[in-house]
Amino acid sequence: EGHGLAILWALTAAFVVGFSSILTGLNFIATIQRMRPPGMGWFDMPLFLWAAYATSIIQILATPVIGITVALGFLERAFHLGIFMPEYGGDPVLFQHFFWFYSHPAVYIMILPGMGIVSEILPVFARKPIFGYRAIAYSSLAIAAISFLVWGHHMFVSGQSDLANFLFSLLTVLVAVPTAIKIFNWTATLYKGSIRLDTPMLYALGFIFLFTIGGLTGLFLAALSTNVHLTDTYFVVAHFHYVMVGGTIMAYLGGIHFWWPKITGRMYPEFWSKLSALLVF
């Protein structure tokens, strides 16, 4: 009984903390849409804000789904309703659908701000304007939109219909397009630039390399013929961590070093920071 009560409290906590994501997303969208300074149009904004805007859309639309899911889990455990648990007559695959409908967009909540940070760092240390500003901005919105259409690729071996598997596979490959647009535009920004390899730039370059590996391994998981063999293997773990650690963490560390002098008024030690960037890589 005590163990069951602990789970109910955990579900309650998860439900309540979801409001922080929803309200933060609303705050960012309202701020970006209504509180830009005079003269700043949509295409005058920093690309980091485009990434934050796309992230906020995901937070507002995806978080309520996981909130409903944990609420149903609470009701099921408290009143023995048959929703997800087979012993009560529920369907665990339904839980998978609800869980992944939130949890796949959630990885884009983590990676999109990192992409925005890289889009800010590269033009500064390549000493030339970002290449393809509008393409990068629109690709952030495209990633946010497509992120809601691919959750079934986590469930290729769960007993879905062949048609559903085919559509989810196709849509998963499609999300590589706006991602590749970013990679190619970042590379074009570097081309013929006067590159300074300061610490933020090292993290940004590390992001591009490691994230590209993560993206390419994702193509093998998107393809039905290879996914059925790779599901539940360390290949999936490697793909995820190349994207989340090689991507998100590298970008966030780069952003911390990039904005640290502006935030604190103090410069970080360049030698030790470069060494840490190489060690993290």
What annotation goes with each model-predicted range?
Residues 1-281:
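Membrane-embedded and interfacial regions of multi-pass energy-transducing membrane proteins
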